[in-house]
Amino acid sequence: MVMRSPTMLAPLLLGALGTILGCGEGATPSQDEHFIEGFQPPALGPNEVRVVAPLVTEIPSGGDVSWCTYIANPFEGEVDVVQSRGFQSKFGHHAILMEVAGAEARLGESRKCTDADMTNARFLAGGSDAAAQFRIPEGVAFRIQKQSVLMIQTHWINTSTSAAVGQAVFNIAVQPPNGTRQAAQLFAAYTAKVTLPPRGPAKATTECKIQQDMSLFALGGHAHEWGTHVRLSIDRAGKNEMLYDHDWEPHFQADPPLTYFETKAPLQLHAGDVLHVDCEYQNTSDAEIRFPREMCVGMGFYFPGTADIQCGDGHWSTGNGGMP
């Protein structure tokens, strides 16, 4: 049961299945009880509950690890996620809460992610610490089905000289579906062909032919600390239209600027349009850097949507789950 009273705590899932804590405005997290040393996620906002993921204990020095943990759906009935914020401890790249159809047999599993984990996964909440800035507009939500199994996918890049332990939490607000909200989902276009020579500039680019009409309420780019510029443009009706054009800063890796659109006037992408994603970099290290240590991604959220869409190096696919 999810308690919505601002004065109650409702621990529903324990141990390997994670924990949900609720809820209320200005609730102060208890580091000693719930969080690892040095990790102090922001307090809960109005009507939010907190999902605390199980620890990731196997992040080796220099490791680039994606970890998948399956938990039971803690909510009674079908609910709409109407706001979400995701947070990670040190070395976190992103944390995403997803719904996975047909994953009942995996309940309680926690391990390195495989391609099978990404099949049939749908975005629900999170992203990165940038989720603190993420806004879900009125009339749109990410829907959790009544009987679903949830998966927490976390990505860690340990740049230290020793092994690390990681933790992720989600502060989310949910409401019962009321017939007026449309379900939304994630769209991402990216390239895995990213190579930065030592101490030099570099570029990466990809294009994606849109396969279906989409209405987006948010659009943005994603690169890491060596990015210097990210552009998204669209070819349609014989013209090229600039959609997103940002100089890049290292902190944008966790806090990328997003462009928002009103749901009554969303950004329209049409079948046959060609989306271009162009990224520029300056490698300040002595080592060659490749994907996924550096990335070039265009991403957004579309509605109505029942499955996430990924377009990797021009290959369109659905239901693969989350960001690259």
Residue ranges of each PLM-predicted region?
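Intrinsically disordered, low-complexity segments enriched in Ser/Pro/Gly/Ala and basic residues
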Residues: R4-S5, P29, Q147
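Beta-strand-centric surfaces of beta-sandwich/beta-rich domains
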Residues: D32-S215, G220-P324
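Bacterial N-terminal signal peptides that target proteins for export
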Residues: M1-L13
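C-terminal motif of bacterial Sec signal peptides marking the signal peptidase cleavage site
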Residues: T19-G22
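Bacterial signal peptide processing site
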Residues: G24-G26
